[in-house]
Amino acid sequence: MSLTELILLAIGLSMDASAVSISNSLCIKKIKIKHILQMAVMFAVFQGIMPLIGYYAANSFENVIERFDHWIAFILLVIIGGKMIHESITADEEQDCSLFSLTFKLLLVQAVATSIDALAVGVSLSALNVDILYSITIIGIVTFICCTAAILLANRFGNLLGKRAGIVGGLILVGIGVKIFVQHMFFGG
């Protein structure tokens, strides 16, 4: 696999994590470096670790991943997105997204939900005899860059949305969950 192919793969894998980063950022009024690092590092680490797990689990784990990955991602993202929408609708006008809290637990769940596909990619990488450490390093770096860019862009527009930012962010998460589910159920992938 060439570097160009690997970067394109990494960009594809990072899209869900970037979209979730946008969703999170829409509910943070003043993004600090701490927020950027928390999100970008968490998503990058999981996008890198999951292919490694898939690579070494390869054949024995492939059927389990393919049968359940879309359900897990769908359920987690719909619950988190639904909670964000509910909190935004029921919040006072002054609160905007103030009920949103970027916790380690939330980021962990989001990182797992958005990196399940990367686990399956790891299975595929094992069949290609690629240098897995090099591959996961590229995937992690690209995910970090994409998430950082997404966070900065979303924060710029999030302040303009006010209370609706939480609703938009929640809808993004629900949309990603539905996309993953539909893609796996009806299009095999």
Swiss-Prot record:
Entry's localization field: Cell membrane
Principal subcellular localisation of the protein: membrane
Keyword Coiled coil: no
The keyword Ion transport is assigned to this record: yes
Family matches, as InterPro entries: Mntp/YtaF (IPR003810), Put_MntP (IPR022929)
Residue ranges of the TM segments: 2-22, 36-56, 71-91, 106-126, 132-152, 167-187
Membrane topology: Multi-pass membrane protein
Keywords per UniProt: Cell membrane, Ion transport, Manganese, Membrane, Transmembrane, Transmembrane helix, Transport
GO molecular function (one): manganese ion transmembrane transporter activity
Stretches assigned to coiled coil: none
Family named by the database record: Belongs to the MntP (TC 9.B.29) family.
Function field: Probably functions as a manganese efflux pump.
Record protein name field: Putative manganese efflux pump MntP
Annotated source species: Ruminiclostridium cellulolyticum (strain ATCC 35319 / DSM 5812 / JCM 6584 / H10)
